[in-house]
Structures are given as structure tokens and as C-alpha cells.
């Protein structure tokens, strides 16, 4: 269940990284069902997927519904691959990735669209052959870098937890891409700007040793419940 737990952890963590104040966001409408589904409640996952499908039937260009539905498909792809159904898993993966990419194309500067794709790809690439996963990991880091650029104007108004999760994703992704200077800069900023995020110990270990503790179970240090 490691892949599922990692997927859940990152998605739960980064969906907090939105604008500091927002009206009823789309993710607030569907996320509890998706979070419960990612934790193993298939009925709740189907409820969340159905909500997205209803929105998309009315508006096929609803960017947030596309990325959420795409995230659900990628989660289902992971389940199929774990069950040994490679063909179905790859079909779901390609479909989910296509939906997430379509959402980004529609709203390339929307944090609530960028973050889901970045989060899912950061997690999914942990289990991929580097030759296949590297381009997707590069895209994930690019998504997070764009989010950071968008949020710089109000980054200090966000809590330590969302700041820490974004910076940790950037740092860890950069390290996995073989970009130690960038990784160091992000880890150092994490310790400075988000000292109580829960990721400071991991950042400090990397700065001292060049390695991170193995992520077992959930990767997010915060407290999230469906």
C-alpha cells in the first residue's frame, strides 16, 4: 500500500496551497470524498468522480474538475497496476494524465490546477523507471516552481504547513533530478520560512547528509482527516 499512501499524503498536503482567501472553491466541494476514496473508501471515491463528471458534462472545459477527475484516474491506475492489470493501469494513467494536462492548458496560472498535477506526478514518479519518470518529474517540479512564483506576493501569509509542503516538494524533486544546488536552496528556505511545518527535520538531514529518511506510509507530516 506504499504507493497509495504516498499518493494520498501528497495530495492531502498540497491541496492546502491555494490563495490565502477564497470563496467556495471547487476542491472544497469534492475533496472530502476524494480524500476518503484515496484512503480506501471506494464508494466515496466514486461519489467524488461522479461529481466531477456531472460538472464536466455541463462544462467540458472546467479546469479544476478535469485535474481532480484526472487525479482520481491516476489513483485508480495505481490500484490496477498493483493488482497486476498492466493494460488497464496504463490506459487509466494515460487518460488521467491527459485530463490533468488539459486542465493546465485551460488555466495555466491557476494554483488550484497546477498543484494537483504537480503533487500526483511527484508521487507517481517514485515508482517509475527513471527514463520514463524523469520528464514527468521535471513537469511536477516546474508546476511547483510556477506556484511558488505566483504565491511569492502573499507567501508569508500562508501557514508554515502549506509553505513547508511546497518547499519540500520543490527541494525533494530537485534532489531526485540531480540538482543539488537547487535542492539545498529550497531546503534552507524551508527551515527559514516554515520551521514548524514538520518538514524541518527532513530538510536538516538532507543538508547534513545529502539524503532523506525513507518515506514509509504517509509523506505529509500534517494532520489530515477525510
Question: Would you name each region that the model predicts?
Answer:
Residues 53-66, 101-112, 148-161:
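Flexible helix-coil transition and linker loops at the boundaries of alpha-helical arrays
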Residues 68, 75, 116, 123, ...:
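"A position-specific structural signal for the A-helix of alpha-solenoid helical repeats
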Residues 27-50, 71-106, 119-153, 164:
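Short coil/linker segments at helix-helix boundaries
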Residues 5-16:
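Bacterial N-terminal signal peptides
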Residues 26-28, 153, 157-164, 176-226:
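Terminal, low-structured helical/coil segments at or just beyond the last alpha-helical repeat
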Residues 62, 69, 88-89, 110, ...:
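Residues that mark the junctions of alpha-helical repeat units in TPR/alpha-solenoid scaffolds
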Residues 145, 167-172:
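An amphipathic alpha-helical core segment
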Residues 8, 20-23:
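Boundary at the C-terminal end of the N-terminal hydrophobic targeting segment
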Amino acid at each position: 500500500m506504499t504507493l497509495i499512501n504516498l499518493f494520498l499524503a501528497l495530495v492531502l498536503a498540497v491541496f492546502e496551497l491555494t490563495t490565502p482567501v477564497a470563496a467556495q472553491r471547487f476542491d472544497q466541494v469534492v475533496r472530502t470524498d476524494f480524500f476518503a476514496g484515496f484512503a480506501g473508501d471506494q464508494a466515496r471515491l466514486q461519489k467524488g468522480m461522479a461529481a466531477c463528471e456531472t460538472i464536466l458534462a455541463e462544462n467540458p472545459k472546467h479546469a479544476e474538475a478535469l485535474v481532480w477527475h484526472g487525479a482520481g484516474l491516476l489513483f485508480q491506475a495505481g490500484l490496477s497496476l498493483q493488482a497486476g492489470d498492466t493494460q488497464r493501469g496504463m490506459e487509466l494513467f494515460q487518460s488521467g494524465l491527459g485530463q490533468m494536462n488539459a486542465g493546465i492548458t485551460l488555466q495555466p496560472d491557476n494554483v488550484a490546477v497546477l498543484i494537483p498535477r504537480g503533487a500526483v506526478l511527484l508521487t507517481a514518479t517514485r515508482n517509475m523507471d527513471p527514463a520514463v519518470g524523469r520528464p514527468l518529474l521535471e513537469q511536477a517540479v516546474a508546476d511547483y516552481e510556477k506556484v511558488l512564483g505566483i504565491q511569492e506576493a502573499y507567501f508569508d501569509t500562508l501557514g508554515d504547513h502549506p509553505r513547508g509542503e511546497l518547499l519540500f516538494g520543490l527541494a525533494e524533486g530537485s534532489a531526485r533530478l540531480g540538482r543539488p544546488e537547487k535542492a539545498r536552496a529550497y531546503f534552507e528556505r524551508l527551515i527559514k520560512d516554515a520551521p514548524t511545518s514538520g518538514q524541518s527535520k527532513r530538510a536538516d538531514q538532507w543538508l547534513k547528509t545529502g539524503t532523506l529518511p525513507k518515506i514509509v506510509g504517509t509523506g505529509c507530516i500534517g494532520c489530515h482527516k477525510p
